[in-house]
Amino acid sequence: MKYDLNFFLGLEIQVWEALKNGDKNANYNLLSDDFLGVYETGLSSKEDHLELLRNGPIISCYEIGASQLIQLSPEITSLTYSATATFLKNEEQKTQVLLYITSIWARRLNKWVNIFSQDTKGNTHY
């Protein structure tokens, strides 16, 4: 069975919307309990990721660019894409960033959850 790119983009958009809306519950439901994030600041657990939303939204807007889906097994997929996002509450208050992201989604108990995400900062002319 081949999986649909748009389905997994839809899941990823739910993660972005949770960051934009400060929705810890949505993020909680989308990330696996053993989630691992790899970011420029280091490794991040599910709890670390949820803590980012403690004071509300962390981005004001985002846009997903070119994307590619690789089916790793019947129950695991890898989604890689580019995104631009305007982050809030950092040293400069608002910073637009270009990212290249790989998220691995696994179906567990008939539900797709994000088990791994790695963000790589790209060069941009903003």
Which residue stretches match the model-derived regions?
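A beta-strand edge to alpha-helix "cap/lid" segment located at domain peripheries
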Residues: 2-29, 34-126
